[in-house]
Amino acid sequence: KFKIYHPGGNIGQTLLLVKDIMIKERNKIPLINFNSNIVTAIKTISKKNLGIGIIIKNKSVIGIVTDGDIRRGTKNYSKKTKIAVLMSRKPLYVGENTSAAKALSIMAENKITSLIVSSDSDYKKHKVFFKPKGILHIHSLLKYGIK
């Protein structure tokens, strides 16, 4: 409980895990069906306000798409184009028991602002397709003082 009640302290920061601060609520996670078109993806990404969409097929992650990917892609594709055409395959992700500090380090190294969160068993097996448990945005890390 120390990590929850004292998140701003050095000890609290090192104890916080991704699962403690990730977005877990399904209605807040930007999930997009792989058959959706660009317009549907834009609406979902805008509504969830994270700048990213998680592309799902059969309840498993198959890729991601960012608002920047869509902006660049609309020059070459119609609004009816399936979002799977624009997605990045094999997105970076972390297990739910990864330290928040490690997650921030991964984001900084890869110049990204969000990480998909999986179960630890999927993460340890390095699964290509996995069920998302949540999403971690850099703003959540900063809110808890993770550096």
Over which residues does each language-model region extend?
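YjeF_N-associated NAD(P)HX repair module
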Residues: 1-16
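Glycine-rich beta-alpha junction loops
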Residues: 6-9, 25, 140
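Short gly/pro-enriched beta-turn/loop segments at secondary-structure junctions
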Residues: 13-16, 23-27, 40, 46-50, ...
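Bateman (tandem CBS) regulatory domains
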Residues: 14-29, 80-91
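The conserved cystathionine-beta-synthase
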Residues: 31-49, 74, 93-121, 129-131, ...
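Helical hairpin unit composed of two closely spaced alpha helices linked by a short loop
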Residues: 52-54, 59-91, 96
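Glycine-rich acetyl-CoA-binding "A-motif" of GNAT/NAT acetyltransferases
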Residues: 61-64, 126-135
